[in-house]
């Protein structure tokens, strides 16, 4: 299995180094749910600004403040502890008057707004995230500048970031041990983290191998293509390749790679044979996913950061802003820019 740091680059290995997250203010994330609170209902959506505390810790503190069980507070995604982040929490408080959440106090956390909502906020139920990153001690400004311009045109590999695999790869290692021993895992969180790490690692492997072999944006017979921003896909046939290639070049269509699991992967013929060969050595992880009934799915191979802009504060410091759809990783953008001395594994999704 290819380690995250050794995955194939789209724009070649960066020529310079830099520091990511010298302090929390260098990594700012603003969650974009893609909808507004309903203004009524048994739930309360709470937008918080936090620095130095993780999402679960804040959710538990909010539950305690509201005198409800911790499971009654949900969120769309974990946000990094060592960053400045804005996100929404959702508390189920039926049949009660609206509590005064301005009285909620927690070090490093501030309530920005809150309102009633009809539905529970579920994990993954967000449109995306806006990022503002500051890279410091950049050793090669010209290389980073060129790469930023190239990313505007060609995007970056849509890899799952190192944080998906746990600190030191602990989640992937757990999945590998589980796959080898077939010992039942009772802890639901471990099961979820380990299965997610296994499937993500296989996806990364497929994308890395495709980048090695050919132009990642070259449509081949049997590729599974999806409309940009959509989840469904269709299979490319030889007769359609020229037209489909035009639509891919125009970023109307995205070529996908497999998220292996039970059931058909979605590709056929040449594309399917390539994907199967790319992960042929990982039979135990594949068998684990099938055994645990994790359904196969698809994910775009490339990621195009939206609203990408940057500003050089000086020759060694650059502020970069962009928006990514849910499930994408800012670290997969950063790794195409610099060899970073920051710690990827501590950056939450």
Curated annotation (Swiss-Prot):
Domain TRUD: 155-303
UniProt keywords, alphabetically: Isomerase, tRNA processing
Catalytic activity as recorded in UniProt: uridine(13) in tRNA = pseudouridine(13) in tRNA
Domain of life of the organism encoding this protein: Bacteria
Family: Belongs to the pseudouridine synthase TruD family.
Entry-linked HAMAP family: TruD
GO cellular component, one term: cytosol
Biological function: Responsible for synthesis of pseudouridine from uracil-13 in transfer RNAs.
Pfam family membership, one: TruD
PANTHER family recorded: TRNA PSEUDOURIDINE SYNTHASE D
Active site: 80
Organism: Escherichia coli O9:H4 (strain HS)
Name the record gives this protein: tRNA pseudouridine synthase D
Gene3D superfamilies: TruD, catalytic domain, TruD, insertion domain
GO biological process: tRNA pseudouridine synthesis
EC number: 5.4.99.27
MF annotations from Gene Ontology: RNA binding; tRNA pseudouridine(13) synthase activity
Binding site for substrate: 27, 129, 329
């Amino acid at each position: 299995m290819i380690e995250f740091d050794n995955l194939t680059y789209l724009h070649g290995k960066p020529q310079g180094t830099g520091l990511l997250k010298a302090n929390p203010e260098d990594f700012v994330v603003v969650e974009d749910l893609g909808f507004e609170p309903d203004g009524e209902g048994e739930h309360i959506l709470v937008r918080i600004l936090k620095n130095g505390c993780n999402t679960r810790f804040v959710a538990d503190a909010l539950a305690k403040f509201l005198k409800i069980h911790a499971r009654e507070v949900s969120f769309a995604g974990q946000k990094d502890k060592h960053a400045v982040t804005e996100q929404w929490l959702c508390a189920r408080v039926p049949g009660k008057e609206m509590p005064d959440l301005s009285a909620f106090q927690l070090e490093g956390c501030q309530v920005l707004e809150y309102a009633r909502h009809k539905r529970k906020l579920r994990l993954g139920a967000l449109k995306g995230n806006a990022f503002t990153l500051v890279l410091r001690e950049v050793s090669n400004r010209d290389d980073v500048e060129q790469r930023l311009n190239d990313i505007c045109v060609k995007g970056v590999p849509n890899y799952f970031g190192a944080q998906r695999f746990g600190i030191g790869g602990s989640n992937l290692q757990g999945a590998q041990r589980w796959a080898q021993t077939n010992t039942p895992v009772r802890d639901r969180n471990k099961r979820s983290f380990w299965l997610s790490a296994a499937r993500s690692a296989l996806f990364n492997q497929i994308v890395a191998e495709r980048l090695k072999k050919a132009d990642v944006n070259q449509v081949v017979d049997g590729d599974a293509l999806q409309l940009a921003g959509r989840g469904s896909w269709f299979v490319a046939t030889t007769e359609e390749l020229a037209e489909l290639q035009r639509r891919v070049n125009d970023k109307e269509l995205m070529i996908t790679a497999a998220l292996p699991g039970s059931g058909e992967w979605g590709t056929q013929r040449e594309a399917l044979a390539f994907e199967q060969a790319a992960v042929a050595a990982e039979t135990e992880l594949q068998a684990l996913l099938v055994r645990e009934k994790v359904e196969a799915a698809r994910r775009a191979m490339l990621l195009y950061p939206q609203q990408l802009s940057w500003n050089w504060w000086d020759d060694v410091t650059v502020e970069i802003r962009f928006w990514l759809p849910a499930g994408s990783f800012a670290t997969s953008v950063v790794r195409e820019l610099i060899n970073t001395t920051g710690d990827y594994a501590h950056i939450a999704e």
